[in-house]
């Protein structure tokens, strides 16, 4: 299907899932600032490299999953499904972007490049190809892709992998299951039609709600532990936001419906984003 360059760029922008990429970039930026070393060129390298690699990984994912996306209402209008971008083209372009992002990270240092590549490989090979179609724990292991973004950011200014970086990565790792299981509970029928064994698809709603609450509860210690590096204001806000997150988790356990799951899902992104922004701001003040 012949399309203009501008239209094709728009299609690829949609395939790259910009709402996820900005959160991954925010994770990388908070990791860079968490180190306490402001190195503009290094931060620029990890943001550019990470953006390319993340976009490439998302595009590969949607190239691979075109058949599943066709039967899910939530994904049925994606450019790959509509035929604007072919499966082969999406995969090739995605690989090129992932490779480019890894090379840009290498301009900073090898560890940054390694974590950028690690995030992409975990998302594409471990999550998309291996676990997502086979295991209800797919998103648990897939959460390492988000952790890798934070680790890449920290490595960009330190060339190291130490306790602050590990804590930030574990925060994102533990945040991921509760966030995406809530989404899967809301769109349970969609995932079921596509044959994707998300936890809420194969387990009862009340059990899924308890697992979402457990994931969120296990996330909170890592959020609070970052107070040691981000300061008192961060600690206070993290405590308040964590209490609100658990409020939504309790509501979901009491009433495990798609509507309550959606409320939990909608709060969890701002929860993480605010914490990441606070880490950045506390290092600037």
From Swiss-Prot:
Q: Does the keyword Transmembrane apply?
A: yes
Q: What class of enzyme is it?
A: transferase
Q: In which pathway does it act?
A: Porphyrin-containing compound metabolism; heme O biosynthesis; heme O from protoheme: step 1/1
- UniProt keyword annotations, A-Z: Cell membrane, Heme biosynthesis, Membrane, Transferase, Transmembrane, Transmembrane helix
Question: What's the superkingdom here?
Answer: Archaea
The biological process GO terms on file are: heme O biosynthetic process
| Compartments where found | Cell membrane
- Catalysed reaction, written as an equation: heme b + (2E,6E)-farnesyl diphosphate + H2O = Fe(II)-heme o + diphosphate
Q: Which Gene3D superfamilies match?
A: UbiA prenyltransferase (1.10.357.140)
Provide the topology term for how it sits in the membrane: Multi-pass membrane protein
Say if the entry is tagged with keyword Endoplasmic reticulum: no
Q: Which residues cross the membrane?
A: 19-39, 40-60, 90-110, 111-131, 135-155, 165-185, 220-240, 265-285
- InterPro entries with a match to the protein in the record: Protohaem_IX_farnesylTrfase, UbiA_prenyltransferase, UbiA_sf
What EC number(s) is this enzyme filed under? 2.5.1.141
What family does the entry list? Answer: Belongs to the UbiA prenyltransferase family. Protoheme IX farnesyltransferase subfamily.
Q: What is the annotated role of this protein in its UniProt record?
A: Converts heme B (protoheme IX) to heme O by substitution of the vinyl group on carbon 2 of heme B porphyrin ring with a hydroxyethyl farnesyl side group.
Q: Which PANTHER family match?
A: PROTOHEME IX FARNESYLTRANSFERASE, MITOCHONDRIAL
Instruction: Write down what this protein is called.
Output: Protoheme IX farnesyltransferase
The organism is: Metallosphaera sedula (strain ATCC 51363 / DSM 5348 / JCM 9185 / NBRC 15509 / TH2)
* Gene name for this UniProt entry: ctaB
């Amino acid at each position: 299907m012949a399309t203009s360059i501008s239209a094709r760029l728009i299609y690829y922008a949609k395939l790259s899932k910009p709402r996820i990429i900005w959160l991954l970039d925010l994770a990388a930026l908070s990791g860079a600032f968490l180190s306490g070393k402001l190195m503009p060129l290094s931060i620029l390298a990890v943001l550019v490299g990470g953006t390319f690699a993340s976009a490439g990984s998302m595009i590969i994912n949607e190239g691979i999953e075109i058949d599943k996306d066709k039967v899910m209402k939530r994904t049925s209008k994606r450019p790959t499904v509509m035929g604007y971008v072919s499966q082969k083209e999406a995969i090739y372009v995605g690989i090129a972007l992932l490779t480019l992002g890894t090379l840009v990270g290498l301009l900073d240092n090898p560890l940054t490049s390694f974590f950028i590549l690690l995030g992409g490989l975990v998302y594409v090979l471990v999550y998309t190809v291996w676990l997502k179609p086979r295991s209800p724990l797919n998103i648990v292991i897939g959460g390492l892709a988000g952790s890798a973004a934070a680790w890449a950011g920290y490595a960009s200014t330190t060339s190291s992998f130490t306790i602050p970086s590990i804590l930030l990565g574990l925060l994102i790792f533990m945040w991921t299951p509760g966030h995406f299981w809530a989404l899967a509970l809301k769109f349970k029928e969609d995932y079921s039609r596509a044959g994707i064994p998300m936890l809420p698809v194969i387990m009862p709603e009340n059990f899924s709600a308890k697992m979402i609450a457990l994931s969120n509860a296990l996330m909170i210690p890592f959020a609070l532990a970052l107070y040691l590096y981000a300061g008192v204001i961060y600690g206070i806000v993290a405590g308040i936001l964590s209490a609100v997150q658990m409020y939504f988790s309790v509501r979901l356990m009491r009433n495990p419906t798609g509507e309550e799951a959606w409320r939990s899902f909608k709060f969890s992104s701002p929860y993480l984003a605010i914490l990441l922004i606070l880490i950045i701001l506390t290092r600037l003040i």
